[in-house]
Amino acid sequence: AGVRVRLEREFRRKRLGPMQYEHITRHLDPANPNVLTIGFARRFATYKRAALILRDRERLLRIISDADRPVVFLFAGKAHPADRPGQEVLREIKRTMLTSEFAGRVVFLEDYDIQLARWLVSGVDVWLNNPIAPLEASGT
């Protein structure tokens, strides 16, 4: 529920319409235990490879399009202001979120903070962790 509230606030701030909000959030139903929620959050450094799942678009589309096994990817976090490649990873995820085939299945949550981190850590089913070894020791 907290994630939907956060998205609603973001959409109001950006003056986006209710249809866009519904399109993006239509699969975020905390009451539906059948939706597999996969999350990635924290710092968007390139060695963490948050967007690796987006590289094979056809495969990702097959994963998220299975009506019997619905999947939603939630991304949240920030890139260091001087990390231009990390900022580009964020932009790639945001662009993907807005495309018709991935809207509502790939979601980026802005304004990452400790409360959002708590919601994600306690609410996602699988934590996405694809770092380049040995640059990341623990997946933080």
Q: Which positions does each model-derived feature cover?
A:
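Catalytic cores of carbohydrate-active enzymes across secretory and cytosolic contexts
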Residues: A1-T140
